[in-house]
A protein has these predicted regions:
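Structured, basic alpha/beta domains of bacterial-type, RNA-associated proteins
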Residues: 2-108
């Protein structure tokens, strides 16, 4: 199995319950396709530098998981037809980094 990091951006006009359902949907999809969830992070509502598909903001989620090519194939197939999503990105990494969350608010 390979290590992956997957980021999803969902539309800004979703309610909190819809956001939770999206996360659960894709976590379940990863598990059903022989993947193993390592960590899921909600980065919250963030502004875009420019409009993307007529949206100025989006909800960001980040999932770290172990999986195979089949897992990625099924994940991205489902995301292509999901109208609640704006963008997604899957990156293969050598190992999962647990040291720092770049979007975590830090106290000064």
């Amino acid at each position: 199995m390979n290590c992956y990091e997957h980021t999803i951006i969902a539309k800004q006009d979703l309610q909190e319950s819809q956001v939770k359902k999206i996360i659960e949907k894709y976590e379940t999809l990863i598990k059903k396709n022989s993947g193993k969830i390592i960590k899921t992070e909600e980065w919250g509502l963030r502004n875009f530098a420019r409009k993307i598909k007529n949206n100025r903001k989006g909800f960001y989620f980040h999932i770290k998981f172990d999986g195979s090519g089949k897992t990625i194939e099924e994940l991205e197939r489902a995301e292509n037809i999901d109208e609640m999503l704006i963008r997604y990105l899957t990156v293969r990494v050598k190992k999962h980094d647990f040291e720092e969350n770049f979007f975590e608010k830090k106290d000064s």
